[in-house]
Amino acid sequence: MPETEDPATGLFIKYLSNNRIFRDREVLRHSYRPQILPHRQPQIDTIASILAPSLRNETPSNILIYGKTGTGKTASVRYVGSELEKASSTMGTTCRIVHLNCEVIDTQYRVLAQIAKCIDDVDEASSDKAKIHIPMTGWPTDQVYSELKNQLDTGGGVLVIVLDEIDKLVKKSGDDTLYNLTRINSDLKNSKVSIIGISNDLSFKDFLDPRVLSSLSEEEIVFPPYNAPQLVDILTQRAAGAFLDGAIADGVIPLCSALAAQEHGDARRALDLLRISGELADRDESKQVTDVHVKQAQAKIETDSMIECIATLPTQSKLILFSMLTLEQLGQNIFTSGEVSRVYQDIAPEIQLDILTHRRITDLISELNMLGVINTRVVSRGRYGRTKEMWFDANTGKIREVVLKDPRLNGLKDLDINQMETKWLKTWFR
């Protein structure tokens, strides 16, 4: 450690003492809940009007909410839910909200158990004797369902169950959970249940029994994508709390908004762009966030998204990518599907991987192009016909690093490229 460095703060002191950009960067996080949601008042009013009967101890209609990622669905539902609980407390009624993320809680057992747990957490009226503690595994599902009904009737009032990313639950576990929840009111004596399903995938309805769909979609609300001017309003509101005065150049918010509007009006993307732009400016010790930082942030987000996409690819697709990386390592920036196929066929036996047909390899190359991992074009070679050429635009070092993290491909780190090149030169490599 340098002699001048304060041991209490260490190497972080210079990063903490030179803040010229942020007032509170948490305001730009997805988890931040603003008091006002610009351009979502019509949807908020509709949700509130549907849930209002719960304040009279009446059963609200079930709601299905649709919209692409970053269109304010979850934030609007959370806002209305918070206001409903405040109104309930003021009026002396019992209205409770349980919010479940079905990407994590994705089985019938876990959904029922988590609802019971959340009721325990929020229901101060229930006595310790009335409270139940359902384990997250181990009970028969019908016992969990029975205990949940008992707890609901003990607490009374109205419970609104929000199933965020409901499509993930349906696709993994079928519609049994929704079937039971949409019919639970017929088994309750002293309480009532309403369900709000949130999804960015309309196709999940195809997996539902018509009776379940009819009960679940008593009301449907669509959240349209934000346009660029609306995103400007959202970012301007957040920026006031997130950045110090004068820390943002004039063109930054319009540029972030325009870029995010191209990505189907995603407010989350716009917020990420603005936050990362600020972080890059902060690290550079710049006095202002500029358009240059926004463009750097855009490139970083696209790279990070692509790397995450590559990490989830099947092993065969990763090996095809590795074959392209090998060609590039040998000096080729553009390669044909035939060249990639031949390198792949030579490398696959090295790691005891089944060799795919050329047709299947071509299909996987098309998928990689569709995902934005590579670029392709079809070119004519006269009497030799047409062929597909491909190349990388992204940082191939990062792609290689992610590909080789696959346990099946890890051994390729030690592949002797020079030896392989000698073999190819003797056979086909030009």
UniProtKB/Swiss-Prot annotation:
Pfam families recorded: AAA_16, Cdc6_C, Cdc6_lid
Residues spanning the signal sequence: none
Stored CDD domains: AAA (cd00009), Cdc6_C (cd08768)
Origin: domain of life: Archaea
Keywords: ATP-binding, DNA replication, Nucleotide-binding
One GO MF term attached to the UniProt entry: ATP binding
Protein residues bound to ATP: 71-75, 226, 238
Biological process terms in GO annotation: DNA replication
Family stated for the protein in its record: Belongs to the CDC6/cdc18 family.
Protein role: Involved in regulation of DNA replication.
Alphabetical list of NCBIfam families matching this protein: orc1/cdc6 family replication initiation protein (TIGR02928), PRK00411.1-3 (NF001625)
Name of the protein this chain belongs to: ORC1-type DNA replication protein
